Amino acid sequence: MPRSNRNDNFIDKSFTVMADLIVKLLPINARSKEAYVYYRDGLSAQNDGDYAEALENYEEALKLEENSTDRSETLKNMAIIYMSNGEEERAIETYRKALEENPNQPSCLKNMGLIYEKWGRIAEEGGEQDSADRWFDQAADVWTQAVRLNPGGYLDIENWLKSTGRSNVDVYF
């Protein structure tokens, strides 16, 4: 049974029905429509916490999807799952792939920075200050890119950049 038929949430189900109608009416090819169905089912599974099913659907969507922006969104969602499962290196790799498809994804950069900053704190707590500084610098690098793409969208990151002395004046313009 398609995932859309199992969704009990009225708003989600309404959205799914509307999206399905739009996809049926739009003049897009069958391959793109099928990719969308896999993506939609992956998103639904991800929202339900069924990450294995979500990843399976996202993998199928990637096999069919040709649009780089849509591929990037699918990869970003996969990376979010890897990140939440503690597969941080795999998440970083997948965020990079998403950015190759669409470099205008500040949320990918933000999430990569969260991982680097976490690794920096772990290294710092372990007394490895040089390693910590390298991770913090990597976090600052990707976060600076994220802030440039989305000025004012990540105030917590802007504050971290300023408070750690890793801020550039031009970041905010």
UniProtKB/Swiss-Prot annotation:
It is found in: Cellular thylakoid membrane. Signal peptide: none annotated. The gene is ycf3. Its main location: membrane. InterPro entries: PSI_Ycf3_assembly, TPR-like_helical_dom_sf, TPR_rpt, Ycf3/AcsC/BcsC/TPR_MFPF. The keyword Membrane applies. This is Photosystem I assembly protein Ycf3. It is a peripheral membrane protein. Essential for the assembly of the photosystem I (PSI) complex. May act as a chaperone-like factor to guide the assembly of the PSI subunits. One of its GO terms (cellular component) is plasma membrane-derived thylakoid membrane. Keywords: Membrane, Photosynthesis, Repeat, Thylakoid, TPR repeat. Belongs to the Ycf3 family. NCBIfam families: PRK02603.1. It comes from the Bacteria. One of its GO terms (biological process) is photosynthesis. SMART domains: TPR (SM00028). It comes from Synechococcus sp. (strain CC9605).
